[in-house]
């Protein structure tokens, strides 16, 4: 075969591969999955297990009904507490979709923080800009155009805790069976919650810790939309038993065997999604960063990074 023919064949193969990858990015973004993790609590914490459902980054807009159905279906899973880590809207037209998605979860206890796309609708930009560093929010956009107050009222009406630069301690009902054959009993787990508004647009203010934060019967959770290091460091200093975040989309376009290219914040790319350990000043906290469920309407693609929700079991340390 002549060199020209070889080059022509190679170009054809490369083109076909590119078309295949592009097609798959459209398929994969429509394949949400539920992931499960276990976090072992430190010895000395006198509590029962707590199962947390985390929902991150739905970015709902018309045409995303498959995500609405997926979120609604999560109500059939077994969990005790819901944490919504923000970026619920993909457009103003998605407001009713957000309520419809979360409605079956409203009879469970929960807490929430917001991301920038709960305040400001996304703007069209080149994907390549994400490769040069975290996206920038225009200082000229200082009046939210999304119905964040209405969404906050919707969550609060169900009893969910608004953790916008707030901290609180609550009792979460959990069902446990003490002995095989027993009927389920309702018990309570005391949970300390600390949250901030979106660090990505510099709305974060670390609140004062509530009384009882360090009590021996209290599970401590740190919640943020974007996992910026300054917030993770504060939560780790406060000895959070688990930090929950979203925002990164897991990198959204990943390289198999390498992982995420970017995190859209100052978090190392190796921590773009999943369960890890964050260390600061001699202390450590488990960190779960969700790859999230949605995408911007202007970049509706995923590769090697399926959309996801997560259930994290916080399990008491095994007794010797």
List each language-model region with its residue ranges.
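Membrane-penetrating hydrophobic segments
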Residues: 1-13
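Conserved beta-sheet core of the metallophosphoesterase superfamily
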Residues: 227-310, 318-319
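N-terminal active-site segment of His-dependent metallophosphoesterases
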Residues: 15-101, 121
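Active-site-proximal beta-strand elements of phosphoester/diester hydrolases
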Residues: 49-59, 188-199, 221-225, 286-292
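Active-site neighborhood of phospho(di)ester-bond hydrolases with catalytic His/Asp-centered motifs
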Residues: 54-56, 81-87, 110-116, 163-165, ...
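Core catalytic region of metal-dependent phosphoesterases/phosphodiesterases
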Residues: 66-171
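Binuclear metal-dependent hydrolase catalytic cores centered on His/Asp/Glu-rich metal-binding motifs
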Residues: 125-160, 164-166, 171-232, 299-302
